[in-house]
Design a protein with these regions (language model features):
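Short coil-to-helix segment of the ABC ATPase nucleotide-binding domain corresponding to the Q-loop/switch region
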Residues: 92-100, 130
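Conserved catalytic motifs of ABC-family nucleotide-binding domains
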Residues: 154
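Conserved structural motif at the start of ABC-family nucleotide-binding domains
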Residues: 2, 17-19
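ABC ATPase NBD Q-loop/coupling interface
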Residues: 57-75, 108, 221-223
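ABC ATPase C-loop
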Residues: 150-151
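The feature captures the beta-strand-to-loop junction immediately N-terminal to the Walker
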Residues: 33-35
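Helix-to-loop junction immediately C-terminal to a conserved catalytic motif
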Residues: 48
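Conserved ABC ATPase signature
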Residues: 133-137
Length: 235
């Protein structure tokens, strides 16, 4: 689904990604791991076209080169993205937040209703709170709204940057259940950054560890050893 080769990125005078090679197989649930400041979010932003890359290639869905494709065009290619901090529209209602994604696609009214109903089926609380402002929701509810909005794009690839950050444990469990369900039922490929090791072990099928902008370990999640955790993840 995603193939990154020899990717380099600079932030000011800092070399943040070094000849990075990462594969995200179609249908996988890939967890990008590493301590803070190691390049995980930077890699996701490169995937989404939010920051420039210096060299290398990013191919998607059978070989489509993403470098040079505008960020809004990448979303239209079937990539849903939920960034750190969720970035919902706090002054808009829940319904209006969902409508933003739907309107951008130019869909017919019946299709918009179908997708809204689908999101409500995944997150009943969003239907109950449809007229509440996004800023009035709890952190967990905002995360559900952000994921729901991304799903209105009907993505082939869903990218989640620390989906469990700052939210209550019961919603963390619900988000884990949802990732597994979407992957199993729809074949949705998921790429997530996650610091919580128990959540990663439960949800991911595969992992990549970044250390100072380099991929230093990768494999099936069952191959993530205690030694790797101690060397690359423990603070």
């Amino acid at each position: 689904m995603i193939k990154i080769r020899n990717l380099n990125q600079f932030y000011g005078g800092s070399h943040t990604l070094w000849d990075l090679d990462v594969d995200v197989p179609k249908g996988s649930r890939m967890c990008l791991m590493g301590r803070n400041g190691m390049g995980k979010t930077t890699m996701l932003k490169c995937l989404m076209g939010l920051i420039p890359t210096a060299s290398g290639s990013i191919s998607y869905d059978g070989g489509k080169e993403l470098r040079g494709v505008a960020a809004d065009k990448r979303a239209g290619m079937g990539i849903g993205y939920v960034p750190q901090g969720r970035e919902i529209f706090s002054q808009l209602t829940v319904e209006e937040n969902l409508r933003v994604g739907l309107e951008a696609r130019g869909l017919k009214t019946a299709k918009k209703k179908e997708l809204t109903d689908y999101v409500h089926s995944l997150f009943p609380v969003l239907k109950q709170m449809s007229q509440r402002r996004g800023g009035d929701l709890s952190g967990g509810q905002q995360q559900q709204l952000a994921i729901g909005r991304a799903l209105t794009l009907e993505p082939k690839l869903l990218i989640l940057d620390e989906p469990c950050e700052g939210i209550q444990p019961n919603i963390v469990a619900d988000i884990g259940d949802l990732i597994l369900r979407l992957n199993k039922d729809l074949g949705l490929t998921v790429l997530l950054v996650e610091q919580k090791l128990p959540f990663a072990r439960r949800v991911a099928s595969d992992f990549v560890i970044l250390d100072k902008g380099r991929a230093v370990a990768k494999g099936a999640i069952g191959e993530l050893t205690d030694e790797m955790v101690k060397q690359h993840l423990t603070v």
